[in-house]
């Protein structure tokens, strides 16, 4: 297999082309790379990019993949190994019998909203932005400029969170990451690094250990709920495909009282714009062939109140694909013709796991399944990262950068507000039962 059309005859070309940056751009064009993908490849390899190109050019390549443990039992074992370090934490021991809210999301938005880590460094981050704004040619100059141009229209807290991301990119010392983890741990947020083949990290968040004064201002009205709650949030780092099915299934098996299952993720949109929020009430799952209809816990009004730039679209219909690389204009056109508007990679398998947690049998294949009464709160929120009809690129490969902060934090806020409101109702109900007990 000749990678990108680069063969032995091109080895000589890499040498002179590497002498100046604009010649590297020419090489990317000759190899058929889109400019953004070529820059992305350079960033991945860093200083090793040119030596890597020389190695690629030296001889034709024969690439082979071997799938290890690709059966249901092996996946189940993998999910149990993934769960063990979570169960071994102090709070993890208690998760079996306490209320648990499962969230599939990234690992930065929810801690930022709950821990106060970023707010406590407001002046530091302001000074950081000012320095890099004065030096636009620096490594983060473009993103700082983009953030500054967005600030008049963005929520100031969201801008601060993005500034924190840029600051940590510029300061990668382990000691700084340790400080952040220590502060979060003091507030009941325990980080569990990915350690198995799933490569999925997690956070165990104990609501009662959070400090009400640290909450994002938009969550401040719910601060009084924290101390009275014994609930735990399990935030898991974007499990995709069948990994999401096996992880949700393992959580349901290990925890007796799962009160909510929520998924926040990127998706391709066939009818909206980059950064818009998409709320589906029906999902076709390519893995099982099932078409799931369900009452999504979130409507446009639940998310739009936290949006300042993007739009929220509900009543969408999603398709869970097996892999983003496999999608092309023909398949996307077929889906759009069947009135699908969202293309993503996790909702279908999660729904299959929810089916098995609420029905006496394993999920079927090729059927239409309607969830009318689910014994737990369930919601899915996507935000558009790709518009494949107008941009020919692998789905999910595009980093949202500044464009994504509005939707990312609106989705996270909607989920956290939902959890806190659910906890308020649960606690009030339990108190009412105690008052009326004989």
PLM segments and residue spans:
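Accessory terminal and edge-of-domain segments that mediate assembly/interaction
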Residues: 1-438
């Amino acid at each position: 297999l000749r990678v990108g059309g680069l063969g032995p005859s091109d080895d000589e070309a890499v040498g002179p082309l590497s002498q100046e940056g604009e010649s590297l751009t020419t090489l990317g064009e000759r190899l058929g790379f889109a400019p953004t993908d070529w820059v992305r490849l350079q960033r991945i390899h860093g200083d090793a990019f040119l030596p890597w190109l020389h190695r690629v050019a030296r001889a034709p390549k024969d690439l082979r993949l071997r799938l290890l443990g690709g059966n249901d039992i092996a996946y189940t074992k993998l999910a149990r190994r993934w769960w063990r370090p979570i169960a071994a934490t102090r709070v993890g021991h208690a998760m079996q019998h306490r209320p648990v809210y499962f969230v599939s999301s990234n690992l930065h938005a929810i801690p930022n909203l709950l821990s106060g880590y970023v707010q406590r460094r407001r002046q530091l981050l302001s000074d950081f932005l000012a320095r890099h704004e004065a030096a636009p040619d620096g490594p983060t100059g473009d993103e700082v400029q983009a953030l500054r141009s967005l600030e008049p229209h963005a929520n100031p807290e969201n801008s601060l969170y993005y500034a924190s991301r840029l600051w940590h990119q510029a300061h990668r010392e382990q000691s700084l990451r340790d400080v952040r983890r220590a502060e979060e741990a003091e507030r009941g947020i325990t980080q569990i690094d990915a350690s198995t083949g799933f490569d999925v990290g997690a956070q165990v968040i104990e609501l009662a250990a959070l400090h009400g004064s640290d909450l994002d201002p938009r969550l401040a009205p719910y601060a009084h709920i924290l101390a009275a709650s014994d609930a735990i949030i399990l935030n898991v780092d974007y499990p995709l495909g069948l990994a999401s099915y096996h992880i949700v299934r393992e959580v349901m098996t290990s925890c007796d009282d799962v009160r909510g299952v929520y998924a926040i993720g990127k998706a391709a949109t066939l009818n909206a714009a980059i950064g818009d929020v998409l709320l589906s009430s029906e999902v076709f799952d390519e893995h099982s062939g099932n078409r799931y209809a369900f009452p999504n816990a979130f409507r446009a009004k639940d998310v739009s109140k936290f949006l300042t730039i993007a739009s929220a679209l509900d009543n969408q219909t999603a398709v869970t694909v097996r892999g983003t690389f496999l999608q092309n204009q023909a398949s996307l056109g077929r889906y759009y013709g069947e009135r699908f508007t969202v293309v993503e990679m996790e909702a279908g398998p999660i729904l299959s796991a929810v089916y098995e947690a609420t029905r006496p049998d394993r999920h079927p294949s090729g059927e239409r399944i309607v969830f009318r009464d689910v014994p737990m709160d369930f919601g899915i929120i996507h935000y558009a990262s790709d518009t494949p009809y107008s941009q020919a690129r692998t789905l999910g490969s595009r980093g949202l950068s500044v464009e994504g902060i509005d939707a990312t934090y609106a989705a996270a806020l909607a989920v956290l507000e939902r959890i806190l409101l659910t906890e308020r109702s649960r606690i009030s109900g339990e108190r009412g039962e105690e008052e009326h007990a004989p």
